Amino acid sequence: MRTVVYPGTFDPITNGHVDLIHRAARLFDRVVVAVAADTGKTPVFSTEERVELVRGSVAGDPNVEILPFEGLLVNFARTLGVSVIMRGLRAVSDFEYEFQLAGMNRRMAPDIETLFLTPAEQYAYISSSLVREIARLRGDVSTFVTPTVQAALRARFG
């Protein structure tokens, strides 16, 4: 079974993330969406809330599994027996960081490959941080996130 792990903070999950998950589900037998618990950031939503928001946003993809994880991603991937990590690249500005991260992961786990996917053009500019800021300022985020996430943001920010 060909499995890929797609890690992220997903605070919150956006339509860009959902696009990548659906596309990965067509390429792989199993997609594990790995929701990072220890991000070094202060998330708006708890790990459990983020897992549920991801679950609600990708319901209907039978080969997608959502799991929280802590610690190094390569260690988590190994515990799952996964040899491919998927990362999204929205713009050239993402590339340098993602390239460094992939290199570090390769150094720690030479048996695990990193695969980069770019989002569909209409999602290339969406980021979780921008969505949070728009929601915090009570703007309309309906074109950036699923209705499940929109409701959660409205409940959080008013």
Curated annotation (Swiss-Prot):
Q: Example GO molecular function term? A: pantetheine-phosphate adenylyltransferase activity
What's the protein here called? Phosphopantetheine adenylyltransferase
Localization annotation:
Cytoplasm
Names of required cofactors: Mg(2+)
Which keywords are on file for this protein?
Answer: ATP-binding, Coenzyme A biosynthesis, Cytoplasm, Magnesium, Nucleotide-binding, Nucleotidyltransferase, Transferase
Which EC numbers characterise this protein's activity in its record? 2.7.7.3
Query: What gene codes for this chain?
Result: coaD
Entry binding sites for substrate: T9, K41, L73, R87
One Pfam family name is CTP_transf_like
Q: Which CDD domains match?
A: PPAT
- Pathway, per Swiss-Prot/TrEMBL? Cofactor biosynthesis; coenzyme A biosynthesis; CoA from (R)-pantothenate: step 4/5
Return the annotated site residues (Transition state stabilizer): H17
Q: Which residues bind ATP?
A: T9, F10, H17, G88, L89, R90, E98, Y123, A124, Y125, I126, S127, S128, S129
What is any one of the record's Gene Ontology cellular component terms? cytoplasm
